[in-house]
């Protein structure tokens, strides 16, 4: 995961100090890209320990089209707690846009199912896109989509994915985003009869919050370790049938966790 440390170092050394919505302040750059070959290990950060359980359950929750945190709470995942209302609702966030994008004629479009079908029937399509950024509904969302749009690409029997992330909290959010979209790519590849290729991560505003500088410096002192391997139950052939128990991580030996505050 040298690529991630390079991003962090680049922002610290070359970024612009800015104010932000949360009042914390950031140092940021605009426009950056990382690439991860999914055939060379699962890109789960090793320079600090990550809570894989939260990453997997959040992705399964997105794929259900769910926008209430009850499922997450039932599975001891708290990463969305700060944004939910008193009923646990978040508004029409990621899952709703992925699975139920509202069309002007009253239909609801299942973008994930549509892309799956197109990967199988028309793998050379340049329209294998899912968007979570719906301008008509952004103001109704508890948090507008940070990871806003992703596109799939098939070549030589491998499925790759590129994510455009408009806003990236490098210390807390980005490690989760890398692992989540890498896993989604692997799951999509399996159910489409393909191998996993690359995950390409493209950023708009990539930033470190000012209250994360000390933690970032500590992480940069640590040497990356060998990437783990993600084993996925090969019997699952339907994307929407995956369960938490279908994933097994082997060989994860990270440095200790580094605590940092979330800016809401």
From Swiss-Prot:
Gene3D superfamilies: Thymidylate synthase/dCMP hydroxymethylase domain
An annotated GO cellular component: cytosol
Top class in the EC scheme: transferase
Binding sites annotated in the UniProt record for dUMP: 21, 126-127, 166-169, 177, 207-209
Substrates-to-products reaction catalysed: dUMP + (6R)-5,10-methylene-5,6,7,8-tetrahydrofolate = 7,8-dihydrofolate + dTMP
Primary localisation category: cytoplasm
Pathway per the UniProt entry: Pyrimidine metabolism; dTTP biosynthesis
Compartment(s): Cytoplasm
EC number annotated for this UniProt entry: 2.1.1.45
Active site: 146
GO biological process: dTMP biosynthetic process; dTTP biosynthetic process; methylation
A Pfam family hit: Thymidylat_synt
Molecular function per GO: thymidylate synthase activity
Sequence positions that bind (6R)-5,10-methylene-5,6,7,8-tetrahydrofolate: 51, 169, 263
Role, per record: Catalyzes the reductive methylation of 2'-deoxyuridine-5'-monophosphate (dUMP) to 2'-deoxythymidine-5'-monophosphate (dTMP) while utilizing 5,10-methylenetetrahydrofolate (mTHF) as the methyl donor and reductant in the reaction, yielding dihydrofolate (DHF) as a by-product. This enzymatic reaction provides an intracellular de novo source of dTMP, an essential precursor for DNA biosynthesis.
Family: Belongs to the thymidylate synthase family. Bacterial-type ThyA subfamily.
Subunit comment: Homodimer.
Protein name, entry field: Thymidylate synthase
Protein's organism: Neisseria meningitidis serogroup B (strain ATCC BAA-335 / MC58)
């Amino acid at each position: 995961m040298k690529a991630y440390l390079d991003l962090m170092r680049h922002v610290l050394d070359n970024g612009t100090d800015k104010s932000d919505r949360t009042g914390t302040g950031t140092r940021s750059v605009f426009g950056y890209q990382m690439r991860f070959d999914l055939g060379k290990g699962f890109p789960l950060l090793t320079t600090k320990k990550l809570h894989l359980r939260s990453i997997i359950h959040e992705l399964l929750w997105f794929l259900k089209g769910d926008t209430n945190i009850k499922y997450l709470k039932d599975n001891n995942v708290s990463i969305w707690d700060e944004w939910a209302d008193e009923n646990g609702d978040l508004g029409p966030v990621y899952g709703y846009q992925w699975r139920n994008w509202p069309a002007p004629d009253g239909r609801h479009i299942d973008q994930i199912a549509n892309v799956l079908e197109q990967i199988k029937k028309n793998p050379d399509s340049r329209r294998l896109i899912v968007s979570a950024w719906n301008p008509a509904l952004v103001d109704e969302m508890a948090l507008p989509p940070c990871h806003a749009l992703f596109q799939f690409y098939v070549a030589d029997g491998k499925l790759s994915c590129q994510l455009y992330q408009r806003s990236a909290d490098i210390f807390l959010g980005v490690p989760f985003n890398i692992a989540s979209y890498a896993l989604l790519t692997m799951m999509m590849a399996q159910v489409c009869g393909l191998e996993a290729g690359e995950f390409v991560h493209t950023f708009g505003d990539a930033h470190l919050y000012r209250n994360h500088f000390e933690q970032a410096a500590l992480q940069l002192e640590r040497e990356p370790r060998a990437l783990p391997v993600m084993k996925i139950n090969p019997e699952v052939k339907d994307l929407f049938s995956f369960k938490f128990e279908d994933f097994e991580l082997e060989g994860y030996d990270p440095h200790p966790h580094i605590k940092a505050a979330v800016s809401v």
